[in-house]
């Protein structure tokens, strides 16, 4: 698996925004990725970032209905990335240059 295929997208929720102050970032990652691979992918994708800890959460599929047809959403995996104290911050929102 390529390192740039591991991280899918950042998770933007109220609780994940509250964790930014503590140096924790939440990403949706590939379900086959393990913690060491996630750490390597974050350090490769963002310059000057050093990862201290990786916590992972497997999110099970939810049942959904469209009319009389039932189905399930896809299972996903979330990773909570904790950065070291001397690490640069990850820029999730690029500021517009005026």
Swiss-Prot record:
UniProt entry tagged with the keyword Ribonucleoprotein: yes
Keyword RNA-binding (UniProt): yes
Keywords: Ribonucleoprotein, Ribosomal protein, RNA-binding, rRNA-binding
GO cellular component: ribonucleoprotein complex; ribosome
Example GO biological process: translation
One term of GO molecular function: structural constituent of ribosome
Superkingdom of origin organism: Bacteria
Oligomeric and partner information: Part of the 50S ribosomal subunit. Contacts protein L29, and trigger factor when it is bound to the ribosome.
Recorded family membership: Belongs to the universal ribosomal protein uL23 family.
Task of the protein: One of the early assembly proteins it binds 23S rRNA. One of the proteins that surrounds the polypeptide exit tunnel on the outside of the ribosome. Forms the main docking site for trigger factor binding to the ribosome.
Protein name in UniProt: Large ribosomal subunit protein uL23
Native organism: Streptococcus pneumoniae serotype 2 (strain D39 / NCTC 7466)
Gene symbol of the encoding locus: rplW
């Amino acid at each position: 698996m390529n390192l740039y295929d591991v991280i899918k997208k950042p998770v933007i929720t109220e609780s994940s925004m509250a964790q930014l102050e503590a140096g924790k970032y939440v990403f949706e990652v590939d379900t086959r990725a393990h913690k060491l691979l996630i750490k390597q992918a974050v350090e490769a994708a963002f310059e000057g970032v050093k990862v201290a800890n990786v916590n992972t959460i497997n999110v099970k599929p939810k049942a959904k209905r469209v009319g009389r047809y039932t189905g399930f959403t896809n299972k996903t995996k979330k990773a909570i990335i904790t950065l070291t104290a001397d690490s640069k911050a990850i820029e999730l929102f690029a500021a517009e240059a005026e």
